[in-house]
């Protein structure tokens, strides 16, 4: 996308200066994006930029991490995410410039840093925001969006009987239709129909995507408060990194989770073998045949390799980033087992996770969770927020050392 977009940018002078200077202030105590923008404001005229070009270059430098953070750490199915990003960018031209700079910045870090998954996230954000900036986008009401999603699915599942389709629709809450991509809903529908026909209680489906660099694991199982923690533990035990998780619960008490795992192997057969191992571990845990701590303990102890690094643990709770959900952001030293520890504690705090977005920046993990309380509402109490922050911070501090707490 970026290679096509750059051809449509009439004036690239500000982009080139931003690419040159975007990290010039790294290593300073102050935010390097802010300092870099000030430096660009001073140097722009000396580089021959006009005042308008200088302003654009400074803006690009100040915002050069924003698109990556939104794409990797926010729920792109949440309209509030798209509105917030559009408010920052404000014009299509700036959106184009920021996309190109973001792609260059990620790809220049080093081999393996750029992945198809990151590219897909950036493309999704770009295409969602572009109509909003063009003035041609009219936001639908919640009920209209729900009806559009169900109508589109009915066309997709043309071979289904009305009774089958109505049964599937009736199993899901309204939020599912609004937050979930149509392709994913169609996959879920086929999976749930297959489970119904086979009388299966626990069903998994695996698909690999070499272009995006991910393997998708879809899990249908009886809802369990620790289910995502079990999934995280199984992935840790198999040496797999979760990059995204969408969690849904049906009206009849089933969990329907779509997990994206970072691709490691060149051949699909190897990816599928690892995914089957993960699925088997999850099923054994749900059936009480395996303990999650035993599954991940050997992996955690054998990879205690990050003690030389230090990242200040941080827990941020924000009720402004989503209209319906509370957003919890975790910043900590990345290590095997971290996601398991955090998701387990979130479950212990009686919070429901609607989606999880997992990113790593060097040795730093940035895990973002969209959550509600058990009634499906945002976390509204300041004392409740304080307790959540305290408990999660304690987990992060304790897990700086490679040791598992068994409970």
Predicted region positions:
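Divalent metal-dependent catalytic cores for phosphoryl transfer on phosphate-bearing substrates
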Residues: 2-135
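Regulatory modules associated with amino-acid/nitrogen control
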Residues: 80, 84-407
């Amino acid at each position: 996308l970026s290679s096509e977009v750059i051809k449509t940018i009439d004036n690239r002078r500000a982009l080139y200066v931003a690419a040159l200077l975007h990290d010039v202030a790294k290593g300073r105590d102050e935010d390097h994006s802010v300092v870099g923008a000030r430096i660009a404001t001073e140097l722009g005229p000396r580089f021959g930029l006009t005042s308008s070009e200088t302003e654009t270059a400074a803006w690009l430098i100040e915002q050069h991490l924003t698109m990556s953070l939104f794409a990797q750490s926010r729920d792109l199915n949440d309209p509030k995410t798209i509105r917030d990003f559009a408010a920052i960018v404000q014009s299509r031209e700036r959106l184009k410039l920021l996309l190109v700079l973001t792609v260059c910045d990620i790809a220049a870090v080093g081999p393996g840093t750029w992945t198809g998954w990151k590219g897909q996230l950036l493309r999704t954000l770009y295409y969602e925001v572009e109509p909003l900036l063009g003035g041609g986008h009219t936001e639908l009401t919640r009920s209209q969006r729900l009806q559009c999603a169900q109508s589109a699915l009915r066309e997709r599942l043309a071979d289904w009987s009305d009774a089958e389709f109505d049964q599937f629709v009736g199993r899901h809450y309204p939020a599912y239709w609004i937050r979930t991509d149509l392709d994913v809903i169609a996959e879920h529908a086929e999976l749930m129909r297959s489970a119904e026909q086979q009388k299966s209680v626990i069903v998994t489906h695996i698909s690999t995507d070499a272009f995006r660099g991910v393997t998708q694991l879809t899990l249908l199982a009886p809802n369990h408060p620790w289910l995502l923690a079990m999934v995280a533990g199984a992935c840790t035990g198999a040496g797999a990194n979760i990059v995204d998780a969408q969690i849904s619960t049906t009206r009849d008490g089933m969990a329907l989770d779509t997990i994206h795992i970072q691709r490691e192997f060149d051949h699909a057969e190897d990816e599928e073998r690892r995914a089957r191992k993960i699925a088997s571990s999850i099923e054994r845990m749900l059936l009480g045949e395996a303990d999650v701590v035993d599954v991940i303990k050997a992996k955690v102890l054998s990879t205690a390799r990050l003690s030389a690094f230090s990242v200040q643990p941080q827990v941020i709770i924000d009720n402004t980033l989503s209209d319906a959900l509370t957003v919890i952001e975790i910043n900590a030293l990345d290590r095997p087992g971290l996601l398991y520890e955090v998701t387990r504690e979130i479950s212990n705090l009686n919070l429901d996770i609607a989606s999880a977005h997992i990113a790593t920046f060097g040795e730093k993990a940035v895990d973002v969770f969209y959550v509600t309380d058990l009634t499906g509402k945002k976390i509204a109490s300041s004392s409740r927020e304080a307790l959540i922050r305290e408990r999660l911070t304690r987990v992060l501090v304790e897990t700086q050392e490679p040791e598992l707490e068994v409970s």
